[in-house]
């Protein structure tokens, strides 16, 4: 499952271990019990979420492949209970792939420059920076040094492996109007995948544990 985001980004589900019933089994092992009927299993998930018993959800694990601007990735990496591997600008020549916000992104802001001109200025700086990057590489400067001229809207790619408990924490903080708009779009994509793979857990999360706002305002 792959969801395109922004102008060139995406979130792709690479792997998932477990589902709603994984949390049920993990919770019931405390009492040496297994699965019951669907109604009672679903009720248990709601009970766990409502009362803050979150460790059973750590037994559901997702791996995502993410392509995002560097400034989004740096916010993402603040979520530390997870595993990350990122594209290396030291070992790889970086492609000309930059996030250019549309003029509509600036609607509602009192800028002294027209939004269309802001987009143009960002594109001009990006072009100049990337040309400089290529010139440095062609002149023998190592990639690890040449890359420092590139701006934060350069796209990077990384793998993110995270359990459902930490994923829900990510959604609490990033699927929220206080987060930057760009990372909100990625959080919505993560929520959509989470809902598809763990519908009972997602529903209970929204009902009892979600602290943000935008997931309740949009259809994921």
Swiss-Prot record:
Pfam families: Thy1. It catalyses: dUMP + (6R)-5,10-methylene-5,6,7,8-tetrahydrofolate + NADPH + H(+) = dTMP + (6S)-5,6,7,8-tetrahydrofolate + NADP(+); dUMP + formaldehyde + NADPH + H(+) = dTMP + NADP(+) + H2O. Pathway: Pyrimidine metabolism; dTTP biosynthesis. The active site is at 174 (involved in ionization of n3 of dump, leading to its activation). Transmembrane segments: none annotated. Binds 4 FAD per tetramer. Each FAD binding site is formed by three monomers. A motif (ThyX motif) lies at residues 78-88. FAD binds at residues 55, 78-81, 86, 163-165, 169. InterPro entries: Thymidylate_synthase_ThyX, Thymidylate_synthase_ThyX_sf. GO terms for molecular function: flavin adenine dinucleotide binding; NADPH binding; thymidylate synthase (FAD) activity; thymidylate synthase activity. Catalyzes the reductive methylation of 2'-deoxyuridine-5'-monophosphate (dUMP or deoxyuridylate) to 2'-deoxythymidine-5'-monophosphate (dTMP or deoxythymidylate) while utilizing 5,10-methylenetetrahydrofolate (mTHF) as the methylene donor, and NAD(P)H and FADH(2) as the reductant. This reaction is a critical step in DNA biosynthesis. Can also use formaldehyde instead of mTHF as a direct methylene donor for dTMP synthesis. Reaction mechanism involved a direct methylene transfer from mTHF to dUMP. FDTS ionizes N3 of dUMP using the active-site Arg-174, providing a new mechanism for dUMP activation. The phosphate of dUMP is crucial for flavin oxidation, suggesting that it acts as the base that deprotonates C5 of the dUMP-methylene adduct. A later study showed that FAD is first reduced by NADPH. Then, the reduced flavin, FADH(-), reacts with mTHF to form a carbinolamine flavin, which acts as the genuine methylene donor. NCBIfam families: thyX (TIGR02170). This is Flavin-dependent thymidylate synthase. It comes from Thermotoga maritima (strain ATCC 43589 / DSM 3109 / JCM 10099 / NBRC 100826 / MSB8).
């Amino acid at each position: 499952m792959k969801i395109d985001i922004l102008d060139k980004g995406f979130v792709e589900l690479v792997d998932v271990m477990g589902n709603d019933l994984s949390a049920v089994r993990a919770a019931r092992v405390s009492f040496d019990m297994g699965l019951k009927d669907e109604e009672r299993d679903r009720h248990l998930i709601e009970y766990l979420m409502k009362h803050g018993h979150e460790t059973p959800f750590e037994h559901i694990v997702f791996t995502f492949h993410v392509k995002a601007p560097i400034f989004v990735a740096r916010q993402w990496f603040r979520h530390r209970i997870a595993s990350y591997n990122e594209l290396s600008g030291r070992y790889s020549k970086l492609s000309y792939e930059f996030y250019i916000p549309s003029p509509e992104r600036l609607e509602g802001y009192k800028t002294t420059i027209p939004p269309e001109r802001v987009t143009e200025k960002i594109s001009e700086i990006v072009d100049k920076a990337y040309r400089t990057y290529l010139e440095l590489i062609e002149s023998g400067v190592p990639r690890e040094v040449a890359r420092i001229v590139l701006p934060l809207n350069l796209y990077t790619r990384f793998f993110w492996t995270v359990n459902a408990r930490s994923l829900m924490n990510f959604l609490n903080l990033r699927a929220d109007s206080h987060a930057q708009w760009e990372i909100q779009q990625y959080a919505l994509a993560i929520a959509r995948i989470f809902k598809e793979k763990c519908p009972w857990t997602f529903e209970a999360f929204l009902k009892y544990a979600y602290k943000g706002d935008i997931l309740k305002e949009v259809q994921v």
